[in-house]
């Protein structure tokens, strides 16, 4: 089984969006049994809160439910459990490293490092650049 943890600052916008989109993709590929997919925050600010209404709205428009998801903070033990820890921006990567201390197995990646155009995914909470419906 491949275990993937998506990580952002608060675990209410970007990382749950990535978690549920990837879950949907894996399910549509018939590979659900091969993956465990979750998300977490590097901060404590939103712990226990549900996915942000703007993120929920976008996922619902795509026919994807994130019901029952509440923000949780990443723990040092997550490094041992997950095969991939994927942050949304360089700040997330720095905070992941602060939590886990070191990455001897090369498990930490930035999300868009897997794309042809590696870059940060801006935090919509502060920038409104990723999906403007969150800021409305």
Tell me what each language-model feature is:
Residues 131-136:
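Conserved small/polar residues in nucleotide/adenosyl-binding loops
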């Amino acid at each position: 089984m491949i275990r993937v943890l998506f990580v952002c600052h608060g675990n209410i916008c970007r990382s749950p969006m990535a978690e549920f989109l990837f879950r949907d993709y894996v399910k549509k590929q018939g590979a659900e049994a091969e993956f465990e997919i979750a998300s977490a925050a590097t901060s404590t600010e939103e712990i226990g809160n549900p996915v942000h209404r703007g993120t929920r709205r976008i996922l619902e428009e795509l026919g994807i439910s994130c019901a029952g998801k509440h923000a949780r903070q990443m723990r040092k033990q997550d490094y041992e459990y997950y095969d991939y820890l994927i942050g949304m921006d360089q700040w997330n990567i720095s905070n992941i490293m602060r939590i886990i201390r070191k990455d001897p197995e090369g498990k930490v990646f930035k999300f868009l490092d897997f794309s042809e155009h590696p870059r940060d995914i801006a935090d919509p909470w502060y920038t409104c650049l990723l999906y403007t419906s969150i800021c409305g």
